[in-house]
Amino acid sequence: MKRIFVFFLLSLTLLMTTFPSKSLSAETIKWYPYEEGMTLGKSQHKKIFINFFAEWCGYCTKMDKGTFVDPEIVSYLNKNFIAIKVNADKENTLSTRYKVRGLPSNWFVSDSGDQIGNFPGYIPADNLLPILKYIQTDSYKQMAFKDFMNVK
């Protein structure tokens, strides 16, 4: 019996070291509920990124498993924005306020709560990073996004 227990422990240890959990070692986006995130945005003077999603939405899941785990996206969002995740099916009032017509819907809001703009639909990580920089640097106040991309 003792040998079986030792064998089990060794096997478990080997299994845990062979397949480390990503969630234990990787940084993740700090998502806030809507009201808390809006309050934090104002108090920390940070712009707000709002991701409207639904559990049935395939592209929302694709963003969760791809875009929102990309280390550059995670780092940039956590450092420069307050990130809010809103389930569009459960938060009808917010979905109406932001005129969400399709999912995913990605909104940017100023620290004072003014809507800056919406980038609807699935956005891969390599496309989202320049959008984040465009909004965070206030370049949206001086130029169109396509012009921002040409200047970079």
Question: Regions from the language model: what does each represent?
Answer:
Residues 28-32, 68-92:
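Thiol-based oxidoreductase modules, predominantly thioredoxin-like and allied folds used
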Residues 30-46, 77:
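A short beta-strand-turn-helix
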